[in-house]
Amino acid sequence: MRRLFTQPQTVLTIAGSDSGGAAGLAADWKTFAALGAYGLGAITVVTAQNSQEVRQVQFVSPKMVVAQMEAVLEDYGAAAIKTGFIGSADTIRAIAECLSRWPEIPLVVDPVLVNHKGQAMFSPAVTEAYQQHLFPLATLITPNRHEAALLTGLPVTTREEMAAAAIQLHTFGPQHILIKGLQEGETMVDGWLDGDAVRARARARGNPSSSSRSSFHWLEGSRVETNNTHGSGDTLSAAAAVFLGQGLEMGVALRRAHEFVRGAIIAAADWQLGTGHGPVNPLFGFYNTDGGKHG
């Protein structure tokens, strides 16, 4: 019998379980599959949630999180790794210590720190653990504008403020920074600080601040009128991880990830799953928007 599929690359997500299937591991694995990758997972937290609320949270011990990571990395390996909801300073430190053994693997860190209203969910110790332990290992970090403000202490309400926050975040050690979710009228704006260009220009000019601002790029799209955006941040960071694992340059990976998550939002814009904040559809390439499978 002829084989129909080539062997996929493996991508590991270190994230939470969402019983509603919209965010966390569910969003990541759907995104990985849609883009041709095989998803591995290390669960950090189990949540009882739906489209309206999070009812209960049970954290997995740092030791068990690391055991999951080691089990898959030592056997399957990974073309890329991403982190999502962690929520514990001790677990962040344990994850960072484990990941330091695989510095060659691209690492995307999505620092989940605020709820959908932009309010901080955790103690300052969690923020500091990201800054001190995970960010220095990261190829890319993907905070939204509220998380960027929390991490830097700076306002992030304009493009200029977004660029300033990204420059501050770069001092914590990540190679690249993508800040998401600035709304300008009917346009949604994400900002990417190209860390490679920052370092190259700083060496050439000796002016890191000027070099940083000239290394900032914008990813824009018209706002989609929908309440179904739950899991969009996870989908974006998961897509970026897949593309980086394929060896794409950062700018190309981010633009493709940006296009992918926009497609996932549009495909689920009219869904009525639950009565609150509904999911996006990372599998839009496989299913029609009316729910019928292609083919």
Language model feature labels by segment:
Residues 2-13, 31-117, 283-289:
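Conserved N-terminal subdomain of the carbohydrate kinase-like
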Residues 8, 59, 251-295:
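Charged C-terminal helix
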Residues 14-20, 216-231:
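Short pre-catalytic strand/loop immediately N-terminal to key active-site residues, enriched for Gly-Thr
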Residues 17, 83-84, 119, 180, ...:
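Glycine- and other small-residue-rich loops at beta-strand/loop junctions that grip anionic moieties
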Residues 124-217, 225:
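Conserved phosphate/ATP/ADP-binding segment of small-molecule kinases
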Residues 149-150, 228-250:
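Short, small-residue alpha-helix embedded
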Residues 162-170, 217, 249-265:
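Short, well-structured alpha-helical segments that form the helix of a local strand-helix-strand
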